[in-house]
Design a protein with these regions (language model features):
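Ser/Thr/Asn(+Pro)-rich, low-complexity disordered segments
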Residues: 61-524
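Extracellular carbohydrate-recognition regions
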Residues: 23-33, 37-45
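Boundary at the C-terminal end of the N-terminal hydrophobic targeting segment
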Residues: 17-19
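Sec-dependent signal peptide recognition
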Residues: 2-8
Length: 524
């Protein structure tokens, strides 16, 4: 199935995603995001109706060495046990003893951090130290034939792996020598991966190290840079090696100087940037914009050219924008505005998911450095996430964000519709969304994590599984590298008074960028 066909099928019939491997579905999902990516003018309807397609999204890169290796073992299915054997560990049981879980917030989050770290350590390729993208267990046992390993990895997952190693050191789960050794092993593998113009490709096979994508992603590249920044702040002996990798990545590569926005990425086989741009400010991509500004690769004007709210004429919006007026911040003209829902005022994200809203807060203390803009917005998004789930959806729990789908072996984009410009639909609740809220509403989030574990069979040997249907109680018995790493890093920040955020802020790139975000006020 082509990515274009899969993307269209998933728009019309979400169950179609179950027919594709996770990494193919993720590429298709990214394609859909590009298809719907807006400019400040109301282009969304034109792009959908006109059927404009990102040409590069239809290509597939076949890992030739990997296919030959599988063939030598009797084919893809026959190779599965060998792939599993490459992992550093495997859970012995499907579920943890619910009655043995701690009953106080701090003790529970500490247990979650320990268990999640054990999972992050287990689900890496032992030879190459790369995290595998996902591990999906069966519904009856942890070790059954139903289990599947997605032995490919994404640049964001590598960046978060670096941050997670630092977090494990901060928590005392590994000593400094072990942590440095783990980072060195990962950096050695990075040195063996194919790159282009200083950047890594978006996907690699963890068994053969072949790239499996033609795309170089702006936002994913920025998370690798963030990981390197945290590492060089934590471990002076690795400073020079991390700095070399950081400095060779010039983010002008993604910058459209005419629009003053970052492209979604670059298609190497087409020698062309993506047609689409990150136009919405309040999205996970904002961290990459700040890194690019802090490095001096793009001007700070870029920050003020991203959309806070779309014009009222954009009828497809989930809510009409309020108080949309021109203003000046740090000498830059911009148009502000906000949405309002049941007394809560906020700048929307694109889909209304917790991932878009709070992933940057893993490394960036927005409440401290941008209290009247990003910090206040983070708090509003958590409040609406909670209230919308409980009051509008009738869920007993909250936390909506892209995650596995409990009903089938697929992936869905979930969010709170009124929190997004377009807004994703509601669906499964995912623990990583609640964990991200630990840095914004710690008491509420910690209590909710305990509630999830007490109410549903969603806590395994390596911490929370990826998602639960709050209506049926059905669980997606999957561990996703991205979601598990976000959960662990958020828990580590909670337990160490934001140590990862402090490491990031201490880096000179971050220090230069922080001045850009301090003056703006989202809601007057």
């Amino acid at each position: 199935m082509s990515l274009r066909l899969l993307a269209v099928a998933c728009l019309l019939y979400p169950g179609a995603a179950a027919a594709a491997p996770v990494h193919v579905w993720t590429e298709a999902r990214d394609f859909v995001a590009r298809l719907f990516s807006p400019a400040e003018s109301c282009e969304l309807g034109e792009k959908v109706v006109g059927g404009r397609v990102e040409p590069g999204a239809q290509t597939v890169v076949v890992p030739v060495k990997k296919r030959a290796w599988e063939a030598s073992l009797g084919g893809e299915e026959a190779a599965r046990p060998y792939i599993r054997a490459r992992l550093a560990g495997w859970p012995a049981r499907l579920l943890a003893d619910r009655d043995a879980l701690p009953r106080t917030d701090t003790e529970f989050v500490a247990r979650l951090a320990r268990d999640s770290w054990r999972g992050l350590e287990a689900f890496i390729d032992r030879e190459h130290q790369l995290p595998v993208d996902n591990v999906r267990l069966g519904v009856a046992s942890a070790g059954g034939d139903e289990a599947r390993v997605g032995d490919y990895t994404n640049v964001t997952s590598i960046g978060l792996r670096l941050i997670a190693i630092v977090a494990a050191r901060e928590l005392g789960l590994v000593d400094e020598q072990d942590a440095v050794g783990r980072v060195r092993g990962l950096l050695d593998t990075l040195g063996r991966l194919e790159t282009y113009d200083g950047f890594f490709f978006n996907w690699y096979d963890t068994t053969s190290l072949e790239r499996t994508s033609n795309f170089i992603s702006f936002v994913d590249s920025s998370w690798l840079t963030a990981g390197l920044m945290v590492v060089r702040s934590a471990f002076p002996e690795l400073h020079d090696e991390c700095t070399r990798l950081i400095e060779r990545s010039d983010y002008r590569f993604f910058y459209d100087a005419d629009r003053q926005r970052m492209s979604h990425g670059y298609w190497v086989h087409l020698a062309a940037r993506s047609h689409y741009h990150y136009g919405v400010l309040y999205a996970e991509s904002r961290l990459g914009s700040l890194i690019a500004i802090g490095k001096g690769d793009v001007p700070e004007e870029h920050w003020f050219r991203m959309v806070r709210t779309f014009p009222p004429a954009c009828r497809w919006q989930s809510l009409p924008p309020q108080a949309r007026a021109r203003k000046t911040v740090r000498g830059h003209a911009l148009v502000g505005g906000w949405y309002e829902w049941k007394g809560e005022r906020y700048v929307p994200s694109w889909g209304g998911s917790m991932f878009e809203a709070l992933m940057p807060t893993l490394v960036l203390d927005e409440a401290r450095y941008a209290p009247r803009s990003l910090g206040a917005n983070d708090a509003a998004h958590v409040a609406v996430q909670r209230r919308y789930a409980l009051e509008e959806l009738g869920y007993p729990v909250w936390g909506l964000s892209p995650s596995s789908t409990p009903a089938n072996d697929a992936y869905g984009e979930y969010g709170v519709r009124v929190l997004g410009s377009l807004g994703y639909g509601a669906g499964a609740v995912t623990p990583h969304a609640v964990a991200l809220a630990l840095g914004v509403a710690p008491a509420e989030a910690a209590a909710e994590l305990r509630q999830l574990a007490a109410r549903y069979d969603v806590y395994g040997e390596y911490g929370f599984y990826d998602a639960v249907d709050p209506r049926s109680g059905q669980v997606a018995h999957a561990y996703l590298a991205l979601d598990q790493a976000m959960t662990f890093i958020a828990a580590a920040n909670y337990l160490t008074d934001g140590s990862i955020r402090r490491r990031f802020a201490a880096d000179p790139i971050a220090a230069r960028a922080l001045a850009v975000i301090g003056e703006e006020r989202f809601v007057d």
